[in-house]
Amino acid sequence: KEGYMVNKSTGCSYSCPKTGESVYCDKECKAKNQGGSYGFCQYSNCWCEGLPESTPTWPLDDKPCD
């Protein structure tokens, strides 16, 4: 699974400053609570690949970004 990482508390995606390689996005994507394999910055948001199907991605159906 792939998609934009989402903060489950706020419903907002993880933001990043510049499209391309991102140490921050890669680290967050690979964190235990996300479980992804590779993350990078795409359109000012962190995109994550290799996510388990159980990991939610943005947008959340039941929680719009505040």
UniProtKB/Swiss-Prot annotation:
It comes from the Eukaryota. Disulfide bonds join C12-C65, C16-C41, C25-C46, C29-C48. The keyword Transferase does not apply. Expressed by the venom gland. It holds the Pfam family Toxin_3. InterPro entries: LCN-type_CS_alpha_beta_dom, Scorpion_toxin-like, Scorpion_toxin-like_sf, Scorpion_toxinL, Scorpion_toxinL/defensin. One of its GO terms (biological process) is defense response. It is found in: Secreted. The keyword Nucleotide-binding does not apply. Coiled coil: none annotated. Keywords: Disulfide bond, Ion channel impairing toxin, Neurotoxin, Secreted, Toxin, Voltage-gated sodium channel impairing toxin. One of its GO terms (cellular component) is extracellular region. Belongs to the long (4 C-C) scorpion toxin superfamily. Sodium channel inhibitor family. Beta subfamily. This is Toxin CsEv4. It comes from Centruroides sculpturatus (Arizona bark scorpion).
